[in-house]
Amino acid sequence: MSINPDAPQSNGEQERQIAIWQLKRTIEKLESYTGSGTSVISLLIPPGEQLSSVTGMLTNEYGTASNIKSRVNKNAVLSAITSAMSRLKLYNRLPPNGLAVYCGEIEEDGKNTKVVIDYTPYKPISNFIYLCDSKFHTEHLRELLTNDDTFGFIIMDGKETLMATLSGTVRTILDRSTVDLPKKHGRGGQSSVRFARLREEARHNYVRKVAERANSLFISSGPTGTNKPIVSGLILGGSADFKNVLSTSAIFDQRLQSIVMKQIDINYGGEQGFNQAIEMAGDTLKDVKLIQEVKLLTEFTENIAKDTKRVCFGITDTIRCLEMSAVEKLIVWDDLPYHRVTLQCVINGETSAPVIKYLLKSQMSNPKYLREVINGEEVQLDIMGDQLLLEWFVDNYKNYGASLEFITNRSAEGTQFCSGFGGIGGLLRWQVDLVEAARFMQESDEDSFMDDLEDFI
């Protein structure tokens, strides 16, 4: 596979990966809840539905629920329906991808707590769902997480060329053309040389036309285009050497050359060859996100090995570099367990300045992690707020001029990143001497540290 690791990820793709993480996080949160009785509501509204119709349906359900014999369960169901109706009133119109509403009374830490969550997914909801149960139903949200990357295919032999895309299970033929190339000639002498030259010219023109057509089909151009490939990767298939010549042709756009994932020898051309190429490229297509992840982490570890001073890792150094706006690519494990905890205390009747710590959930209940030396005295701090660090990154990474890259621990490189580097790191815009930065931070307050930034970059 020859995807260029230096090729920047488009903002649209980055936003999509963040939206996928947010959806996974929402699903995990919903699935962790246990309803108090059979009274929690799962409501999924696909685009095209009228909010007034959904509100009318909930009104009817309210009337039906009023006949529930159990007083406790009846009140819980009525309360959940009321919460759902109140949440719908916040929307003047249905969001383009539809709306998911989850509400009801759950059991959490031995207490009953009301939960109301409304969520607009990054992909359209397909079916209308209304369920009242003892748990939140997330099956239909999970369906949205199925791989929807779009891949391009160029199937090319000496008779025809087919260009197509594959997205999930949807196969779309974009273009199909035939060619009549001169056959090898059996004559000798000057005729042989002339026919060989004509044959080579015809093959060259054929490859040129295919390259030009591929450039126009697989790159979003024009006044409203992004000038980027419209596919995540390209598969080149064929029964002769045409695909190899195409992949190195100067006419074949560099932006497409950089995303060629695999070249496949197949027995057929046209649509039959397209189907065979899909089958033979199955493992490559399945692991494309993983391959991109491995390339990113390889770049990360190579910077460490070469001591370029353009890389950071661990929470302390990464946060420090992020606050300096030195981080170009913020790399985080998508299951990073740390929380960003805000702590304060009252000293001599005055509230102290907020202290930020990065703690595991288990550490947040241990007093030894909630102590801090303030004005020369060690004091016990109170938790004023906490947020999953990943959520804080999603909310704030743009403020520091960074891109946000999620990685998993499904590869050897990902496992090493999580266990060896704490699951968090970054590629830097400029060199930073982190040892000098740490020493300087200990000797200076934050303001003077930022003023003298040039001392260690």
Swiss-Prot record:
Matching InterPro entries: eFR1_2_sf, eRF1_1_Pelota, eRF1_1_sf, eRF1_2, eRF1_3, Peptide_chain-rel_eRF1/aRF1, Ribosomal_eL30-like_sf
Domain of life: Eukaryota
Localisation per UniProt entry: Cytoplasm
Transmembrane segments annotated in the record for this chain: none
CC per GO annotation: cytoplasm
Alphabetical UniProt keywords: Cytoplasm, Protein biosynthesis
Endpoints of the signal sequence: none
Single GO term (MF): translation release factor activity
Gene3D superfamilies: 3.30.1330.30, eRF1 domain 1 (3.30.960.10), eRF1 domain 2 (3.30.420.60)
Major location (coarse): cytoplasm
Family membership: Belongs to the eukaryotic release factor 1 family.
Role this protein plays: Directs the termination of nascent peptide synthesis (translation) in response to the termination codons UAA, UAG and UGA.
Subunit architecture: Heterodimer of two subunits, one of which binds GTP.
UniProt name for this protein: Eukaryotic peptide chain release factor subunit 1
